[in-house]
Amino acid sequence: MRLLVSCVDSGSIKEVLCNIGTDTSVQSALQPFHVAPHLAEGLKAYVDRMWVISEDEAILARNSGVVELVKISKHLKENEALQVDPKGESKNEKSLSDDLPKFDISEFEITSSVSDLFDDAKLESLSSKSVKRTKLVDGFVTLCPIKKDSSNNTFVAATKSGLLHIIKKGEDKKLIKLASLGLKAPVEFLQLYDLEDTDTDKYIFAYGGEENLIKLVEIDSSFQSLKQIWEAKNVKNDRLDMRVPVWPMALRFLEPSPGKTEKGKLNYQFAAITRWSHLTKYSTQHGRKPFAQIDLLPNREPLSQMEVFDAKGENVVSLLGNFQSETCNDLNVISTDYKKNVFKFDGNGRMLGKVGRDDITGSSTYIHVHDGKYLLQGGLDRYVRIFDIKTNKMLVKVYVGSRINFIVMLDDVEIEMPLSPSAKAAKEKQKRKVTELEEDADELWNKLEGKVAASKASKKSKI
């Protein structure tokens, strides 16, 4: 497995190469083959968001307001020193190369960047109104291609202050800022819609935040203007006739509502997680209020993130994280609180369990479901973990020495381990045995075919 991990304390990204079963907290367990930092720029410039464009290119968004294009090159890891066997004799180079696993490691080079993408002044006036105890600071909430085609060279970079930047990678491999548009702040999330082929000259996305109701926005292909096409409405007052606070934290689209639809009304469906531990479900055909609001936690403990996956174990999540289904029947949700819990819920809000409940010791600052198979998790306890999405079993645990902000899995290919001399001999013996059995089978079939041919020939001669 090859991972890229955003490390907050050093402002670097670390490349981690490991196999299933790796656990750095256990001395006798399998250890990672390679952990190395790259592009360190310090605490004030850590990587907020990453998007891998291809095997040799990625785009990074840092909390200093900079978006960078990074070239990735790979080369075979060189053995820096000879191993010494228990007798104290140095192994020769051929023996060393046979005993160590072989794998490629990456080098990273910044080839282009765009800066000054934040507006902290816009958040200053909102800090006094926020229930947060700390000053609001700008940061990136989204970095992704504007089309669902992963090879697309035009990206959306959205910030907490409500700035929506359209950035393009030119033919000369340089980043160009095409446009900057404004949204209502503060923004906790911005989610693009990619579940069906819409008009090529329009793009749809949803956004929201603290006291900022969910809105659907349409942007044209020229990126010069945007239009709000729908806005949610708050639910009715609670049983004490108190206003329910608004704070959507994350959202995922579903496919359009099936069956009969009312003409003239938009047809979008989505589910959202709120700060106050509600799972809300919307259909624009139904109206502006959610058609379902479910309390996920009894004491309304704050939730911060949202990932979705299919209850049947199939990969039905789009490139941008939306759920490729018309209903919530098979929808499962993963969310995190600000303590140490990673919760799994079904589409009706029933808790299915906690992931890593006996191992995670700090708040999870990042979770992501990869290919419908793995849950990537990292946080304040400085460990990268990979869990099996079905069984919740921990597959990988690697200490990276820093708070974690983002994780990307480049591949899940296992690195082949070299065999000991006895294992090699056993493997060769088994290989010879299989070859002998195949040769014996071929010889037997040839004899049978020869007898059949001779029998047919004798019958013809008698006739």
Curated annotation (Swiss-Prot):
Where would one find coiled-coil regions in this protein? none
Q: Which GO terms describe its biological process?
A: ribosomal large subunit biogenesis; rRNA processing
What keywords sit in the KW lines? Nucleus, Ribosome biogenesis, rRNA processing
Q: Which domain of life is it from?
A: Eukaryota
The listed locations are: Nucleus, Nucleolus
Identify one Gene Ontology CC term for this UniProt entry.
preribosome, large subunit precursor
InterPro entries, per database record: WD40_repeat_dom_sf, WDR74/Nsa1
Q: Which family does the record assign?
A: Belongs to the NSA1 family.
| UniProt subunit comment | Component of the pre-66S ribosomal particle. Interacts with NOP7, RRP1 and RRP5.
Q: What does this protein do?
A: Involved in the biogenesis of the 60S ribosomal subunit.
**Name the record gives this protein:** Ribosome biogenesis protein NSA1
The organism encoding this protein is: Saccharomyces cerevisiae (strain YJM789) (Baker's yeast)
